[in-house]
């Protein structure tokens, strides 16, 4: 099981490398953003019958995945998280090396992200953006970490779109 109590999340544990792509490293500190994004994507895709596929009242490491009965749901989402990290990281690194810049709309979104999350946190009664993010991404989540995650995702997505649009057929 990958599950650990919040008290066990020391800097040493959070800084352990779990995957790499080129010169980039994924640590336990950033893995939850990718992990929970896998779950949220799954929940969105299968929202009509999500309740029949996974029991959200039980830990994911105690339920077998309906798509692959050799994996728990936790293992399934972890595999997806690492795979997504590698794809995002490869595109993000290539974008940086090529001098790619986010478009104005994406950059504006990124620039306003901290304020957007802070306002959402306050509207739901959380004392801070970090506290709000920790309910969605786990006890080590921070606004800085989330911002970095979103910046990578946006850059990778926009860069891939630019590559596709530049292709001639």
Q: What spans do the regions from the language model cover?
A:
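Short, low-structural-confidence N-terminal segments
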Residues: 1-73
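Short domain-boundary/entry signatures in modular proteins, especially
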Residues: 13-16, 87, 169
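Charged, solvent-exposed helices and adjacent loops that form client-binding or oligomerization surfaces
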Residues: 40-80, 84, 96-169
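A generic alpha-helix surface/boundary motif
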Residues: 88-89, 93
């Amino acid at each position: 099981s990958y599950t650990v109590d919040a008290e066990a999340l020391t800097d040493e544990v959070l800084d352990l490398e779990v995957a790499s792509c080129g010169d980039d490293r994924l640590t336990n500190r950033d893995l939850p953003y990718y992990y929970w994004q896998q779950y949220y994507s799954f929940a969105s895709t299968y929202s009509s019958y999500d309740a029949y596929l996974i029991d959200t009242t039980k830990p994911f490491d105690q339920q077998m995945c309906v798509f692959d009965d050799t994996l728990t749901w936790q293992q399934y989402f972890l595999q997806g998280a690492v795979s997504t990290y590698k794809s995002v990281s490869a595109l993000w690194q290539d974008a940086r090396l090529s001098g790619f810049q986010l478009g104005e709309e994406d950059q504006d979104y990124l620039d306003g992200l901290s304020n957007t999350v802070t306002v959402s946190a306050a509207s739901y009664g959380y004392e801070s953006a970090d506290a709000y993010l920790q309910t969605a991404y786990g006890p080590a989540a921070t606004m800085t970490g989330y911002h970095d995650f979103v910046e990578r995702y946006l850059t990778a997505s926009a860069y891939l779109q630019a590559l596709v649009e530049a292709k001639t057929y």
